[in-house]
From Swiss-Prot:
Gene: TIMM23
Highest taxon, organism lineage: Eukaryota
GO biological process, one term: type 2 mitophagy
Protein name: Mitochondrial import inner membrane translocase subunit Tim23
Compartments where found: Mitochondrion inner membrane
Membrane-traversing stretches: 73-93, 125-145, 172-194
PANTHER family named among the record's database cross-references: MITOCHONDRIAL IMPORT INNER MEMBRANE TRANSLOCASE SUBUNIT TIM23, TIM23
Source organism per UniProt: Bos taurus (Bovine)
UniProt membrane topology term: Multi-pass membrane protein
The keyword Calcium is assigned to this record: no
Keywords: Membrane, Mitochondrion, Mitochondrion inner membrane, Protein transport, Translocation, Transmembrane, Transmembrane helix, Transport
């Protein structure tokens, strides 16, 4: 047995000497600093102290300078575009209804189709322009109020809605501006109430307990 082991060692040593690998052995610590040509080094995140992985607060991956929530300026584009599309769709349906009502005594022919199509396009453009203008004014007032106050809350929503209604109806005099402001205040107030309904219910339940 010992002779076999010795002959095996001699054979291994001979092969090692043949391939140029003979000599003193190297440990893993000695080879740790040897650069690997043509290979990527090991990731530095493989050996990390677990204490550095504990986070006390929530963190989000955000672009530099970005807020955790969208501001008024970011939402303005979506608001204006959505209102224009909604107005166009509603106006088209209203125009179709009016066109069919006004031409109900006419037979189905090309003049009737043209008249209905004109009514659809006219009403669609009218409502899209109206809602788009309101959304533009509302977004502009919201951005201005947010930058002025330095805060984003429901007060900005209500104030922007009130000012939008007043400015949109200011051509009707003080009474028209007052009516427009009241309409904007009512709509935005209901919207703010809807957004905070769950929070208000939770507060009431906590007070009752």
């Amino acid at each position: 047995m010992e002779g076999g082991g010795g002959s095996g060692n001699k054979t291994t040593g001979g092969l090692a000497g043949f391939f140029g690998a003979g000599g003193a052995g190297y440990s893993h610590a000695d080879l740790a600093g040897v650069p690997l040509t043509g290979m990527n080094p090991l990731s530095p995140y493989l050996n990390v102290d677990p204490r550095y992985l504990v986070q006390d607060t929530d963190e989000f991956i955000l672009p530099t300078g970005a807020n955790k929530t969208r501001g008024r300026f970011e939402l303005a584009f979506f608001t204006i575009g959505g209102c224009c599309m909604t107005g166009a769709a509603f106006g088209a349906m209203n125009g179709l209804r009016l066109g069919l009502k006004e031409t109900q005594n006419m037979a189905w022919s090309k003049p009737r189709n043209v008249q209905i199509l004109n009514m659809v396009t006219r009403q669609g453009a009218l409502w899209a322009n109206t809602l788009g203008s309101l959304a533009l004014l509302y977004s502009a007032f919201g951005v201005i109020i947010e930058k002025t106050r330095g805060a984003e809350d429901d007060l900005n929503t209500v104030a922007a809605g009130t000012m939008t209604g007043m400015l949109y109806k200011c051509t009707g005099g003080l009474r028209g501006a007052a009516r427009g402001g009241l309409a904007g205040l009512t709509l935005t107030g209901l919207y703010a109430l809807y957004n905070n309904w769950e929070h208000m219910k939770g507060s009431v339940l906590q007070q009752s307990l």
